[in-house]
């Protein structure tokens, strides 16, 4: 009898412990992006950007396990693959071996994720190799006026880099509450090696509401561009941009969105190999966005010093630092072959059509015109389609 009672007690305890343990659930994360971006800059002599066409598609499936330890906290581990194809980049040889598609698989993605709902805020974190679209520095423009990151100048990350360098290798932490959003990330861009520089970039963004029509925030980045096995020479590139954003919707009720944002942009640059010391660069930017239903206009005007002073400076390997050092829009150089400290103007004017199709689908057709103090530099015709199915759970129906 005692043995039976003891066995029943142990069985009951085991059942209670098993019931208390979180049950893992299979999850998947799927992203698809199609981009057509025709760039014509002959009008300005291709001073800042060469004419070219980006026409490519990407699929990023990932599968894993979610472990909800409570109603407020969930841990996730996922692994996937980045599948990418530049349209028209097929092999020309008739040899079967050269026609296989293994080259479409660019790199593995694998990451740990945390979702935590706190009493007054939501905390999310990722560590590993994960899609850049989880960050405001990698997410595409959406029709939502409340979407954080709409006010990030292209100085911090160019459209092309946002598309081609689609993964973060490091860590991302975000925090949000009603009316505010904050994030910081570390992206390890290069491991010290032969012909490969050690480099990393830290980026941060924050925005919070002060009044119903006024918000304040910041955008910041620190890029450390260091040595390779063959060459020595370190460059530090720091950019900080506090901003104020005004919602003018009440003044223009006939429009769906009217927003005016003012950025102060402070750059601090240093080329240690050339002993430049800390070189500051000052500037300001005003951004006006107007939207009515599916049609909008966004105009960004920057005036100030060049924010990419070493773009054309030869590095220790004899090649200009260029886009390897500066990950933003090259028009923020302001001048080429001139003193970067002389202030100048850059104007980016975009007309777009962006219908609301579905919450997980973003379609955007745009024409983007670029102007400097020399006049019209060129324009882009863009069509982008983005599909994001994030952290969907595969539930067991049995």
Enumerate the predicted regions with their spans.
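Exposed, low-structure sequence patches enriched in small/polar residues
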Residues: 33, 56, 177, 181-182, ...
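Positively charged n-region of N-terminal signal peptides that target proteins for export
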Residues: 1-4
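Surface-exposed coil loops of outer-membrane beta-barrel proteins
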Residues: 121-207, 222-224
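A short acidic, glycine-rich active-site loop
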Residues: 69-71, 158-164, 336-338
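Short, solvent-exposed beta-strand-terminating loops
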Residues: 38-39, 127-136, 302-316
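Hydrophobic h-region of N-terminal signal peptides that target proteins for export
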Residues: 10-19
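Beta-barrel outer-membrane channel/assembly domains of diderm bacteria
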Residues: 20-118, 379-398
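Extracytoplasmic loops and strand-loop junctions of Gram-negative outer membrane beta-barrel proteins
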Residues: 43-47, 93-96, 153-157, 187, ...
């Amino acid at each position: 009898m005692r043995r039976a009672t003891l066995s029943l007690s142990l069985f009951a305890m085991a059942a209670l412990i098993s019931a208390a343990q979180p049950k893992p659930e299979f999850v998947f994360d799927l992203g698809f992006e199609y981009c057509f971006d025709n760039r014509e800059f002959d009008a300005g002599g291709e001073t800042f950007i060469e004419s070219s066409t980006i026409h490519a598609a990407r699929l990023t499936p990932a599968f894993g396990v979610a472990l909800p330890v409570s109603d407020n906290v969930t841990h996730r581990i996922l692994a996937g693959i980045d599948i990418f194809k530049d349209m028209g980049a097929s092999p020309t040889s008739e040899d079967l071996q050269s026609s296989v598609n293994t080259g479409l698989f660019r790199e593995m993605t694998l990451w740990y994720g945390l979702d935590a709902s706190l009493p007054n805020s939501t905390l999310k974190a990722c560590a590993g190799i994960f899609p850049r679209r989880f960050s405001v520095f990698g997410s595409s423009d959406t029709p939502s006026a409340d979407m954080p990151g709409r006010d990030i100048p292209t100085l911090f990350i160019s459209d092309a880099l946002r598309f081609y360098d689609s993964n973060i290798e490091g860590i991302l932490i975000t925090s949000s509450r009603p009316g505010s959003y904050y994030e910081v990330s570390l992206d390890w861009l290069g491991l010290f090696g032969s012909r490969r520089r050690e480099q990393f970039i830290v980026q941060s963004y924050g925005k919070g509401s002060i009044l119903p029509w006024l918000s304040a925030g910041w955008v910041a980045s620190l890029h450390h561009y260091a040595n390779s096995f063959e060459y020595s020479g370190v460059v530090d590139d720091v950019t900080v941009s506090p901003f104020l954003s005004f919602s003018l919707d009440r003044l223009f009720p006939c429009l769906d969105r009217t927003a005016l944002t003012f950025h102060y942009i402070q750059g601090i640059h240093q080329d240690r190999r050339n002993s430049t010391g800390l070189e500051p660069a000052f500037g300001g930017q005003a951004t006006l966005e107007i939207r009515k239903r599916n049609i909008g206009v966004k105009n960004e005007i920057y005036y100030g010093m060049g924010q990419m002073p070493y773009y054309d400076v030869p590095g220790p390997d004899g090649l200009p630092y260029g886009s390897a050092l500066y990950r933003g829009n090259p028009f923020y150089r302001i001048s080429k072959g001139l003193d970067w400290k002389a202030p100048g103007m850059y104007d980016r004017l975009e007309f777009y059509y962006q219908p609301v199709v579905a919450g997980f689908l973003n379609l955007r057709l745009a024409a983007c015109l670029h102007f400097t103090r020399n006049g019209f530099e060129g324009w882009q015709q863009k069509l982008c389609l983005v599909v994001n199915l994030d952290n969907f759970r595969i539930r067991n129906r049995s």
